Each structure stands twice: as C-alpha cells, then as structure tokens.
C-alpha cells in the first residue's frame, strides 16, 4: 500500500485540536463587511471548531493528521 498524500490546501487551512476536533477560519470575512454590526465581526474573528459533519470530510484530506 503506497503512502497517502495530504491535500496541500487542507493542511494550510485547518488545524487539529488536542482532542481531535478541527478548527478553521470563518468564511465571508474578506470584504463587504460594512453592513454587518461590530458584534458579528468580533465573534467571527479567529478560528472556530467545525461541525462534525464537515470535519469528517476534511479528515479524508488529512490522512495522517497535521
């Protein structure tokens, strides 16, 4: 069985926590933020833990973790 390759885009965008959950940056934060209030912008700063359904798909891109 050959070694599995890690998807390069996934290793740049996602981080694993110590308990095995995946963290990722919040989408929709590049531009057009004038209409959003400060609370929305503040709460979506940094990274968030992904839902288990999405994390299951991303784990297939990271066969050996990070």
From Swiss-Prot:
Keyword Lyase set for record: no
Pfam families listed in its UniProt record: Ribosomal_L35p
Disulfide bonding pattern of the chain: none
GO molecular-function term, one example from the UniProt record: structural constituent of ribosome
Gene3D superfamilies registered for this protein in UniProt: 4.10.410.60
Signal peptide residue numbers: none
Family classification: Belongs to the bacterial ribosomal protein bL35 family.
Name of this chain's protein: Large ribosomal subunit protein bL35
Species whose genome carries this gene: Caulobacter vibrioides (strain NA1000 / CB15N) (Caulobacter crescentus)
Lineage: Bacteria, Pseudomonadati, Pseudomonadota, Alphaproteobacteria, Caulobacterales
Primary gene name: rpmI
């Amino acid at each position: 069985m050959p070694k599995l390759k890690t998807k390069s885009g996934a290793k740049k965008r996602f981080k694993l926590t110590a308990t095995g959950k995946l963290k990722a940056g919040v989408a929709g934060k590049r531009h057009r933020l004038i209409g959003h209030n400060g609370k929305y912008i503040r709460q979506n700063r940094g990274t968030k833990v992904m839902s288990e359904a999405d994390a299951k798909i991303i784990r297939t891109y990271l066969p050996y973790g990070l």
